[in-house]
Design a protein with these regions (language model features):
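Membrane-interface capping segments at transmembrane-helix boundaries
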Residues: 21-23, 312-328
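Long, low-complexity, intrinsically disordered cytosolic termini of multi-pass membrane proteins
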Residues: 321-400
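"…together with the soluble PPM/PP2C metallo-phosphatase catalytic core" -> "…together
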Residues: 1-235, 286, 384-398
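Juxtamembrane transmembrane-helix termini
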Residues: 158-161, 165, 215, 241-244, ...
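Small-residue-rich transmembrane alpha-helices that serve as helix-helix interface/gating elements
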Residues: 297-313
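Cytosolic, membrane-interface loops and tails of multi-pass inner-membrane proteins
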Residues: 17-42, 237-269, 329
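Structural signal for the N-terminal portions of transmembrane helices
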Residues: 216-225, 292-302
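Alpha-helical transmembrane segments of integral membrane proteins
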Residues: 263-285, 290
């Protein structure tokens, strides 16, 4: 008990420190992605993976909390997937290769002895689906951190009930590490998990659910589904919507659950809160089913709610969130730096193009002078404060 508290606290603090430490190297090396016009480092997954691995290794090395065979395979396979994702964060990684890596790693950790060959194959497919759902949450600040922490916390309770101490410790450490990471990932995020963290967290959680289910399968398949309902909903929503639209299933786009919640008017923190509440509700049902506090049929309510969410979100158009300015090339309401430079030069000089009586406005058609009337005068010169603000926005790479 005491070691569990110390391990969770250590993982939280260590991951928080590492998440702050990886920002500067990622910015200098250009391992970033643009979110709403900001350059955000994508090495948060390295911090989470290092924090969880360090605490787990200390417990195994000291003999105070040995992980056991199941937890050891999970963390090693998850770390391998995380390294594969890190390659994708630094260089472009084909989606097919990432999917093949998930399938290969799942094939190494599935408990065939308890599930059988057919059950093991179904487990591999289910792990791939859930990992895909968790991976999609990285596109929204804070979403994967909150949903992953809630799921890991509930899963640690399930593992403790089955006296799987190694897995229970691993999941509690992962929940604490994600909580520490959220200190830097809450909207607007200062660092994100990237593909590395998404594959590591998603795989450890999905594989852990399968291991716990293999031991306590008397509760039925409702508990594993409820524990990962939010990730499953996101994966199914994306696959169905892309299939209906005739798009490639593995090509990314703004069609995940978090994107659609933004489209209906939620703010970025609001999206995180809603997803966290959904994850807490569904994971709580899964924990209750596994602990035999409620009937296994309760999972049908979760399945019905999940189906309603998928059907409802299919009618939400895919695109930039409401309130984003039209004409933004990236769909985020941010004017590209090149267009902003042209507009700033035009405002700063108040230049005229063409003969007298014609004043050309950048990006708009020229206005003809009225015969016998006065020609439009030049645009007023911006104030000194306006020029300073435009220069600062241009230095950051965006306008507006």
């Amino acid at each position: 008990m005491l070691y569990g508290i110390l391990a969770a606290a250590s993982a939280l603090l260590l991951t928080a420190v590492l998440s702050a430490a990886v920002r500067l190297p990622a910015l200098r090396l250009g391992i970033v992605e643009r979110r709403r016009g900001r350059r955000v480092p994508v090495l948060g997954g390295v911090a989470v993976m290092a924090g969880v691995g360090a605490v787990a290794w200390v417990g195994e090395w000291s003999g105070v909390a040995p992980l056991g065979q199941e937890a050891g395979r999970l963390i090693v396979a998850g770390a391998g997937l995380g390294l594969l994702g890190l390659v994708g964060d630094v260089w472009r990684l084909p989606a097919v290769l990432a999917a093949a890596g998930v399938v290969a790693a799942a094939a190494l950790v599935v408990p065939y002895h308890e599930l059988g060959v057919l059950g093991g194959v179904c487990g591999i497919a289910w792990i791939a689906l859930v990992v895909h759902g968790f991976k999609g949450m990285t596109r929204s600040d804070g979403a994967l951190g909150v949903v992953g922490a809630v799921t890991a916390f509930a899963l640690s309770g399930c593992a403790a009930a089955e006296v799987m101490d190694g897995l229970a410790t691993l999941f509690s450490v992962l929940a604490a590490a994600l909580t520490g990471f959220l200190m830097h990932n809450w909207p607007p995020a200062r660092v994100v998990l990237g593909t590395c963290g998404a594959l590591f967290v998603g795989f450890v959680l999905a594989g852990g659910v399968l291991h716990v289910y293999a031991v306590g399968y008397g509760a039925g398949v409702g508990a594993p589904f409820a524990l990962t309902a939010v990730a499953t909903v996101d994966a199914v929503l994306v696959l169905v919507s892309r299939k209906r639209a005739g798009r490639e299933l593995w090509r990314g786009g703004p069609d995940h659950l978090a994107h659609r919640l933004r489209r209906i008017g939620l703010t970025p923190p609001g999206v995180v809160v809603v997803l966290g509440m959904l994850a807490a509700g569904s994971a709580g049902v899964g924990l209750a089913i596994h602990m035999l506090w409620t009937e296994p049929g309760t999972a049908w309510w979760v399945a019905g709610a999940a189906g309603a969410v998928v059907l409802g979100m299919l009618f939400v158009p895919v695109g930039p969130p409401r309130g984003a300015r039209a004409g933004a090339g990236s769909g985020t309401g941010v004017v590209p730096a090149a267009d902003g430079a042209v507009a700033r030069r035009a405002r700063a000089t108040g230049a005229r193009d063409g003969p007298t009586g014609v004043h050309r406005v950048p990006g708009a058609a020229a206005r003809r002078s009225i015969p016998g009337g006065r020609a439009p005068g030049p645009s007023p010169r911006p104030s000194h404060l306006g020029r300073q603000e435009a220069a600062e926005l241009g230095r950051r790479g965006w306008v507006g």
